[in-house]
């Protein structure tokens, strides 16, 4: 849950595309999101590894040991996994819904855990973008590859 909190509870994602034809539709997302996705790259802004969690500019690939996976099921549930001790561990289970080009995540009480704008979802690659708590100028993008 710490990873989902760090990624999604930072508030919401905002699309930057100036071409509306590039923004995936609700149906595109619903059709293509089902499956296991692994984070592979981050860009924009992120938090450093200190206790202060300072904002830093990033544009880097994510080593597998630091990546996480999200399993989206067709029934509207999502599971998040992190890598530790040479295996994947369940980190949290959520419900999700797709509205426009957004994926809205709900905790077990039905409260919104986070919202992600899907900038792109084509083939085996998806790009999500979020706005960090510090303000709308602080965007964080995560690229995912479909594992299966």
What is the predicted role of each segment?
Residues 1-3:
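Bacterial N-terminal signal peptides that target proteins for export
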Residues 11-15:
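C-terminal motif of bacterial Sec signal peptides marking the signal peptidase cleavage site
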Residues 18-93, 97-148:
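Lipid interaction determinants
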């Amino acid at each position: 849950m710490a990873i989902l909190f760090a990624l999604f509870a930072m508030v919401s994602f905002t699309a930057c595309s100036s071409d509306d034809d590039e923004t995936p539709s609700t149906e595109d997302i619903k059709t293509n999101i089902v499956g296991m996705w692994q984070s592979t790259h981050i860009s924009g802004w992120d938090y450093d590894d200190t206790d202060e969690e300072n904002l830093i500019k990033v544009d880097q690939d994510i080593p597998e040991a630091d990546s996480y996976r999200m399993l989206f099921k067709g029934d509207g549930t999502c599971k998040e996994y992190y890598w530790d001790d040479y295996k994947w561990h369940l980190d949290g289970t959520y419900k999700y819904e797709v509205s426009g080009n957004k994926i809205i995540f709900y905790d077990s009480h039905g409260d919104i855990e986070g919202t992600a704008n899907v900038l792109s979802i084509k083939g085996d690659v998806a790009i999500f973008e979020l706005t960090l708590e510090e303000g709308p100028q602080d965007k964080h993008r995560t690229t995912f590859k479909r594992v299966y």
